[in-house]
Regions:
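Repeated loop/turn-to-beta-strand initiation elements of outer-membrane beta-barrel proteins
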Residues: 2-7, 43, 53-59, 66-68, ...
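C-terminal hydrophobic structural anchor segments
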Residues: 141-195
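Residues on the lipid-exposed face of transmembrane beta-strands in outer-membrane beta-barrel proteins
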Residues: 1, 45-49, 103-107, 140-144, ...
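Aromatic- and glycine-enriched pocket-lining scaffold segments that form the walls
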Residues: 1-48, 181
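Transmembrane beta-barrel strands of outer-membrane/channel proteins
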Residues: 7-11, 59-63, 117-121, 140, ...
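Hydrophobic, lipid-facing positions within transmembrane beta-strands of outer-membrane proteins
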Residues: 41-45, 99-103, 136-140, 154, ...
Length: 201
């Protein structure tokens, strides 16, 4: 489990900036490799813009430090994307920092049809030796609100899971040769004001 704090402030119809951070439960441990500044942590900021009633834009940045060098992509995507500098001999012993950049956009094609997309880029760096890795991901979603009844939503998602595209140092060979593509369809059915179910495939 992680502990976290998020602060945000909204300027109606214009922008919503926010900042926050998370750290594992070991943040309160005084032992080596733990604590707020010596253990794994995440600091992030985000800015949501609404240039018009039909368009929303989002910018996000996160700075992470992982003391073991694993889970760089939040345990999503390929093994290389999550463990860019790990190997059979050194897994779990390669502390890594990473800068994560994201761009999001959403527009109303009609009152009930929403098209959204986002892309992300991560640059990870080893802290115990030379090594830098580039990781990319993206997704596109289409959602139809009130489809089949008020409060229901039919949605489709297509995208690429986090993929390690380049690497350097003694793990330069750890690069994904193929992309992990993801396709989903779901239907959120509103049973009542307090209950909904979402089957998907």
């Amino acid at each position: 489990p992680n502990l976290g704090l998020v602060l945000s402030y909204s300027v109606p119809r214009v922008a919503t900036p926010g900042v926050g951070g998370t750290a594992p439960e070991t943040v309160n441990s005084p032992t080596q490799g733990n604590g707020l500044f010596n253990g794994s942590n995440t600091l992030f900021s985000q800015l949501t813009l609404k240039p018009s009633d039909n368009l929303k834009l989002g910018l996000a940045y996160a700075r992470t430090y992982n003391s073991t060098g694993t889970g760089v992509s939040g345990n999503n995507g390929t093994n290389f994307a999550n463990n860019p500098f790990s190997s059979a001999a050194g897994a779990g012993n390669r502390p890594t920092t990473a800068d994560h950049y994201s761009l999001l956009a959403s527009t109303n094609l009609s009152p009930n049809l929403i098209l959204s997309g986002w892309g992300g880029y991560t640059q990870a760096r080893r802290q115990d030796a030379a090594g830098k890795a580039d990781i990319w991901e993206y997704a596109l979603t289409l959602a139809a609100k009130d489809f089949g009844g008020k409060g229901n939503t039919l949605g489709f998602v297509a995208g690429m899971q986090p993929k390690l595209t380049s690497n350097s140092g003694d793990t330069a060979a750890r690069v994904d040769a193929v992309s992990g593509l993801n396709f989903e369809a779901f239907y959120k059915y509103k049973v009542s004001d307090n209950l909904s179910i979402t089957p998907g495939l």
